[in-house]
Amino acid sequence: LGLASLSATLAFALAVPLAWWARMSHAARLVVLAVAALGLALPGPVVGLAIIELMNDPRLPVLNWLYDHTIVPPLLALVVRGLPVALLVLWFAVFSLPWQLFELAQLDGVSQWAQLRRIVLPLRWPAMTAGWLAAFALAMGDLSTSILVLPPGVETIALRLFERLHYGAEDQVAGVSLALWLGFGLIGAVAVGMLTRQARTTKPRRPAARAAT
C-alpha cells in the first residue's frame, strides 16, 4: 500500500502541471498527448527492462546504488505506469472548466500558474481525487512492470498473489483476491462518484424563466 500510495502521489504531482501546461498552446497539447499515449502503449515488461538498463549503467554508480538498496526502481516503474491514466483524468478536469474564468483571471492580472492554484485546484478537486485513485489502483494491481525491478525483501500485493498462486495456496489466493476485488470496487465507485459530481457541476445552468407580465 505504501509503494502504491507514493507512486500515485508522484504520478499525480507530475500530471497536474502537465495537464495545465497542455491548455496553454496547441504544441503543448500534442506533447502531453504523446506522453500519455506512449505511457499507455508501452508494455509493462518493456518499462521494467528499460529501468534495469538505465540503473545498471556503469558510468552512473549512484544509480547502481539506488537500484540495489532502495525502492526507487519499482517506484519509478509504477509512476511511469500510473502517469498516463492520471494525466487523462486531469486533462478532463482542466479542459472542462469554462474558458471565461481564465479570461477574467487574466484581466485581473493573475498569472497562469496562479490560476491553476486559485481556480483549477479548488473547483476540480473531485476529479483530481479520481485521478489519484486511478493511479493508485493501477499501482496496486501492477505485476508485469514491478516484478522485474523489485529489490529483495520488498513485496507488493500483486506479487504476493502471484507467488501464492504459483505454490498452490488456493485459500490464501482466494482471500487476497476477494480483498482486492472489494478494494478495487470501492476505489472505482469513489472515482466514478467524484467524476459524476464533477460533471454535474460542469453543466451550464439554464437561466430562470421570467415571470409573465
Language-model regions: role of each:
Residues 13-18, 49, 73, 80-101, ...:
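Membrane-embedded alpha-helices of multi-pass transport/permease systems
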Residues 3, 29, 114-131, 176:
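Start (N-cap) of specific transmembrane helices in multi-pass transporter permeases
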Residues 140, 146-192, 197:
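Interhelical loop and adjacent transmembrane-helix boundary motif
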Residues 16-54, 102, 208-213:
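Cytoplasmic-entry segments and transmembrane alpha-helices of multi-pass inner-membrane transporters
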Residues 1-24:
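Transmembrane alpha-helix signature in integral membrane proteins
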Residues 21-22, 26, 91-106, 110-118, ...:
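C-terminal transmembrane helix and the adjacent membrane-cytosol boundary/short C-terminal tail
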Residues 26-32, 45-81, 113, 149-153:
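Membrane-interfacial helix termini and adjacent extracytoplasmic/periplasmic loops
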Residues 35-42, 75-84, 136-140, 150-151, ...:
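Hydrophobic transmembrane alpha-helices
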